[in-house]
UniProtKB/Swiss-Prot annotation:
SUPFAM superfamilies: Anticodon-binding domain of a subclass of class I aminoacyl-tRNA synthetases (SSF47323), Nucleotidylyl transferase (SSF52374), tRNA-binding arm (SSF46589), ValRS/IleRS/LeuRS editing domain (SSF50677)
Pfam families to which the protein is assigned, alphabetical: Anticodon_1 (PF08264), tRNA-synt_1 (PF00133), Val_tRNA-synt_C (PF10458)
Protein name (Swiss-Prot/TrEMBL): Valine--tRNA ligase
Motif window: 'KMSKS' region: 527-531
Catalytic activity: tRNA(Val) + L-valine + ATP = L-valyl-tRNA(Val) + AMP + diphosphate
Annotated GO MF terms: aminoacyl-tRNA deacylase activity; ATP binding; valine-tRNA ligase activity
CDD domains for this protein: Anticodon_Ia_Val, ValRS_core
Primary localisation category: cytoplasm
Gene of this entry: valS
Keywords carried by this UniProt record: Aminoacyl-tRNA synthetase, ATP-binding, Coiled coil, Cytoplasm, Ligase, Nucleotide-binding, Protein biosynthesis
Binding positions for ATP per the UniProt entry: 530
Organism of this sequence: Bdellovibrio bacteriovorus (strain ATCC 15356 / DSM 50701 / NCIMB 9529 / HD100)
Assembly behavior: Monomer.
Keyword DNA damage included in the entry's annotation: no
């Protein structure tokens, strides 16, 4: 990498990021080796849609994966992060159809072959733009291995799996109820159904009894579907209707006879306790229809309009039919009442139209047999979910699994490998294109028009991306993969199906660990969406604040499986952290200009005779944070790891250590200065390596400027206490205690200055009240640091003495106790201070009363978020301490 002699005055993320990423790629640091003596660690990237742009969910997902890959790479693993994109059948076809519509052309005008060519043209032009955005984030993928779900190799795998499952009787064609999008004229998956709360109506319709003795009232939100009713249903133990079970009612407006049946599915308490059963247009009714052997009457066309079974309403759109039917019911006095009703209605995420449960001929996978081994590997711990609570959710779904509809009425995707003979009607299922019927030899064949659900090819992703069905070295080395990172919304659509397919075709699980993260929400906790206008573009955030700041924001708020409230204000805070790191490195490097890099490099040790207590202290703190980060990363506690690093770098290294060492670096003791310079160089080296998985760009840039470094931070060893014993042994628990006492005393002095609004330019007189000889010695040994950093005129160490008209702050560090006493005579107006303190006491007393009342309310404690309750309790405790302190001050000032 082309490096300047020193770090620039200001940190410019855009300059550093583009240059650094290009250098990493050029040097092949992301590449995995199919054959290596290093232990393998692999992650398969959940393939984003080829139509997509990087969104906040991706950015979080990718940050977690890249942190793990970089951490494992630095720990000596042969890492492979394999990227890819999904052809996204419905999404991509919809995008291209919208483009054609601008020219007044439909896909049907073009025909299938030319339309698919258009989609490929679009894919070649726009399909890889998300890769560029992933690079902006810092994704260290092995780009040479990138795969597309319609690549030839994946297509080969898809066909092989289809044929194999079909031979085993696990794939079949049948008529079942599916989610149907009328505008798209295709079945869609549950994931493509968005449920919205709709303010509608509940219509109470009279169904006349066949014998003319009265009627039953049925409540429905969709009166138009009554055209497909096969029965009305009551609870078998409902005394109101027991005598009617087995009799008939006349379907309103048509007078078609339908039976009154009984089933425990019915809720006796809802509405009238009578429900209409429409097996061809409701998923619950479908099951009842199967149980009671009812007629399945489809009343919709593929465009979701009323078909010929709708009689006089045929040809109407659903909403038009509803309006007409309601008018006719009123005219015949068959509508008892209409009342407002809010209910959930499924909408197609692509077209926006209401999703219709629709009876159609589709291809399905039998899931029950495939689910058995998939349950076993979760139960016996072969696969681990993090957080563990998701294991129960996964198992619950598998225990209630239904067959999977895998066919879609689209043109873009993996076409179903089934050919129909026009002469003998035989079906040929094959891995390669068929030219003649395997039964009669006829060449009059046509391939099934449907394509496979996108999730079908995605289910094979962990092994199809590695070259299967060929026995490749990649497959031998990296399957099963080590880690899967994903959101909880696709556990069933993708994770479970990958596990099933991996066990079926590789006889092993596809991954060992499934890390489930929460959703990225806005600052108010709302889900990000276009309709709310609260979506945030991660690329825009990167351009404003830098990729490292965004990554660190995610890492610092990654609590096990919980949703994350994102705000730009938080991001700005971590941008400030990056600036802090940059400026600290600039200061340190400016004081290393005359430092001669030792030939031993990272193994070089300072002279123990000349090492300062401050050096010993920072090394002790470095050991602590190294152990904390290592343990947290091993347990996937990314927030704990990043927060510990943040606190060490900002608080210990930048705010304290650098300030402590300034007198040494500017002093005349050459031996002590040389020792401190070496410690600074070594600690900075380790900080950059510790920081790298979280903030790769800034850490690499600074690392390359260090006098002690390897080839590249990205491939240097990640710090751990076991391999760094010699350097870390220079730390000292006693030194750590000493400096912690000194820090707390300085902090107390600064707090008193701030609380009493005393200018930093005014040097203070301080008395440190202490009786313990050892503590007196510690304070005496660090007089220079206390005087300089406390901005003191004079400092006495000894008995407490008179504390009237003084500010007092107690300091306790382990067994050491110090009272910081600062005379305020001539520095503050005591009358004004007494007024201010009294006002503060009044306010705190009110606040404490409100908080106490809130926390004594059992309903609030039971229903509020745990974090809110904990925060209120902490605030109450803090407020009580502040109140005691103010009362003490009031006594001294009066």
């Amino acid at each position: 990498m082309k490096m300047s002699e020193q770090l620039s005055d200001r940190y410019n993320p855009a300059d550093v990021e583009s240059r650094t990423y290009e250098w990493w790629e050029k040097n092949g640091y992301f590449k995995a080796q199919d054959q290596s003596t290093k232990p393998p660690f692999s992650i398969i990237l959940p393939p984003p849609n080829v139509t997509g742009f990087l969104h906040m969910g991706h950015a979080l997902d990718h940050t977690i994966q890249d942190m793990m890959i970089r951490w494992k790479r630095m720990n000596g693993y042969n890492t492979m992060w394999l990227p890819g994109t999904d052809h996204a059948g419905i999404a991509t076809q919809s995008v291209v159809e919208r483009e054609l519509k601008k020219d007044g052309v439909t896909r049907h005008d073009l025909g299938r072959e030319k339309f698919v060519e258009k989609v490929w043209d679009w894919k070649h032009q726009y399909g890889n733009r998300i890769y560029g955005q992933m690079r902006r984030l810092g994704d260290s993928c092995d780009w040479d291995r990138a795969v597309f779900t319609l690549d030839e190799g994946v297509s080969k795998a898809v066909r092989k799996v289809f044929v194999s499952l079909h031979k085993k009787g696990l794939i079949y064609r049948g008529q079942r109820l599916v989610n149907w999008s009328g505008p798209l004229e295709t079945a869609i998956s549950d994931l493509e159904v968005e449920h919205k709360q709709i303010k509608g109506s509940l219509y109470h319709v009279k169904y006349p009894l066949e014998d003319g003795s009265g009627f039953l009232v049925v409540a429905t939100t969709r009166p138009e579907t009554m055209l497909g009713d096969s029965a009305v249903c009551v609870h078998p133990e409902d005394e109101r209707y027991k005598h009617l079970i087995g009799k008939n009612v006349l379907l309103p407006l048509t007078n078609r006879k339908i039976k009154i049946i009984a089933d425990t599915y019915v809720d006796k308490e809802f509405g009238s306790g009578v429900v209409k059963i429409t097996p061809a247009h409701d998923f619950n009714d479908y099951k009842i229809g199967k149980t009671h052997n009812l007629e399945f009457i489809n009343i919709l066309t593929k465009k979701a309009e009323i078909n010929e079974n709708g009689g006089v309403y045929a040809g109407l759109k659903v909403q038009e039919a509803r309006k007409r039917i309601l008018e006719d019911l009123k005219a015949q006095d068959l509508l008892e009442k209409e009342e407002p009703h809010v209910h959930s209605v499924g909408h197609c995420s692509r077209s926006g139209a209401v999703v219709e449960p629709y009876l159609s001929e589709q291809w399905f996978v039998k899931m029950e047999a495939l689910a058995v081994p998939a349950k076993r590997v979760a139960e016996n711990g072969t696969i681990r979910f993090e957080p563990e609570s998701w294991t129960k959710v996964y198992l619950h779904w598998l225990n209630n699994i239904e067959d999977w509809c895998i066919s879609r009425q689209l043109w873009w995707g993996h076409r179903i490998p089934v050919w129909y003979c026009e002469d003998c009607n035989h079906q040929t299922v094959a891995e390669t294109d068929v030219t003649a019927c395997e039964k009669c030899g006829s060449t009059k064949l046509h391939q099934d028009d449907d394509v496979l659900d996108t999730w079908f090819s995605s289910a094979l992703w962990p092994f199809s991306t590695m070259g299967w069905p060929n026995e490749t070295e990649t497959l031998k080395t990296f399957y099963p993969t080590s880690y899967l990172v994903t959101g909880h919304d696709i556990i069933f659509f993708w994770v479970a199906r990958m596990i099933m397919m991996g066990l079926e075709f590789q006889r092993d699980v596809p991954f060992r660990t499934v890390y489930i993260h929460g959703l990225v929400r806005d600052s108010q906790g709302r889900k990000m969406s276009k309709s709310l206008g609260n979506s945030i573009d991660p690329v825009e955030m990167i351009e404003k604040h830098g990729a490292d700041a965004l990554r660190f924001t995610f890492a610092a708020h990654l609590y096990s499986g919980k949703d994350f409230k994102f705000s730009e204000q938080r991001l700005e805070g971590y941008r400030n952290f990056m600036n802090k790191v940059w400026n600290a490195a600039r200061f340190a490097l400016s004081n290393l200009s005359d430092f001669k890099a030792p030939t031993e490099g990272v193994k070089a040790l300072p002279n123990k005779v000349h090492i300062s207590v401050f050096d010993q202290w920072i090394i002790t703190k470095l050991e602590e944070v190294t152990k904390t980060v290592e343990e947290a990363m091993e347990q996937e506690r990314f927030s704990d790891a990043s927060t510990a690093l943040y606190q060490f770098i900002w608080n210990q290294f930048c705010d304290w250590y650098i300030e402590f060492t300034k007198p040494i670096l500017n002093g005349n003791n050459a031996e002590e200065k040389a020792a401190t310079q070496l410690v600074i160089a070594q600690v900075l080296n380790r900080i950059m390596r510790l920081l790298h998985p979280f903030a790769p760009f800034i850490s690499e840039e600074i690392y390359q400027k260090l006098p002690i470094k390897g080839t590249a931070c990205i491939v240097d060893q990640y710090p751990n206490a076991r391999n760094d014993k010699e350097f870390l042994s220079l730390g000292s628990a006693q030194a750590a205690l000493e400096i912690d006492i000194v820090k707390e005393v300085i902090t107390a002095i600064r707090n008193i200055r701030g609380e009493n609004r005393i200018s930093p330019a005014v040097k203070l007189n301080v008395r440190l009240g202490v009786t313990n000889d050892q503590t007196q010695k510690i304070l005496g040994n660090n007089r220079t640091a206390l005087m300089t950093m406390g901005r003191l005129e004079n400092m006495e160490i000894g008995p407490e003495g008179d504390m009237m008209k003084c500010a007092v702050a107690p300091v306790v560090v382990k067994d050491a106790s110090v009272k910081v006493i600062i005379p305020l005579e001539g520095l503050v107006d005591f009358d004004e201070e007494v007024k201010r303190i009294n006002k503060s006491i009044e306010k705190l007393t009110r606040d404490i009363g409100m908080l106490s009342g809130k926390l004594s309310n059992e309903k609030f404690v039971a229903n509020a978020d745990e974090e809110v309750v904990a925060a209120d309790r902490a605030l109450l405790a803090q407020s009580k301490v502040q109140l005691d302190s103010l009362r003490d001050a009031l006594t001294r000032f009066q």
